[in-house]
């Protein structure tokens, strides 16, 4: 919803064939799902896909660049070959580091899910995560955890807010992500909102009337 206002596009297509935009859109979703399946919980913050008719470029932004670049270097090269076999075109995969992972809603949501799956108290996890986000310069953050919290029989929703999260305007740079935490006692839903900077307000312009003679 905020693409073109505070968010840049994460997919670019250059098409000179008879393929429609829907075909490229479906292929883009398959590429992203394939990346998440190949590198699960690898601190991937964002994936940018640029495609032409014969080749493409994939830029992976991650907070754990050592996991992808060194530990999984052979797997990364194998991943490029798998992309060519699966989608029929050559892809160049680039990996870039996220300098401040605490300002990425996806990275923080994965961190919360890992803590919940390790049976850490959800209140402690949420409050510690909010503190990390605010310390890195965010204006505000909101965390929502839902379902059988604390391993109780009754499902409920708990919300934790620190600072300001203005969802009423598109001009605020708000990062959002949601996922599921697979715990021993069931599936928990995790949602994270992070406001990086506020909307800019401009003073109203007043027109001066010409004096009458």
Question: Which role fits each region the language model picked out?
Answer:
Residues 1-72, 76, 187-201, 208-213:
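N-terminal, positively charged regions that mediate nucleic acid binding
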Residues 1-2, 7-11, 95-213:
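Positively charged, low-complexity, intrinsically disordered RNA-binding extensions
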Residues 18-29, 59-78, 102-107, 115-124, ...:
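Ordered, soluble secondary-structure elements with a strong preference for glycine-centered loop motifs
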Residues 32, 36, 77-84, 113, ...:
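Generic solvent-exposed, charged/amphipathic alpha-helical segments
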Residues 36-46, 84-89, 134-138:
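Short secondary-structure junctions
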Residues 45-48, 80-82, 179-180:
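Short beta-strand/turn micro-motifs at beta-sheet edges
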Residues 49-64, 90-110:
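Short, charge-patterned binding micro-sites
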Residues 68-94:
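Acidic, low-complexity central loop/insert segments
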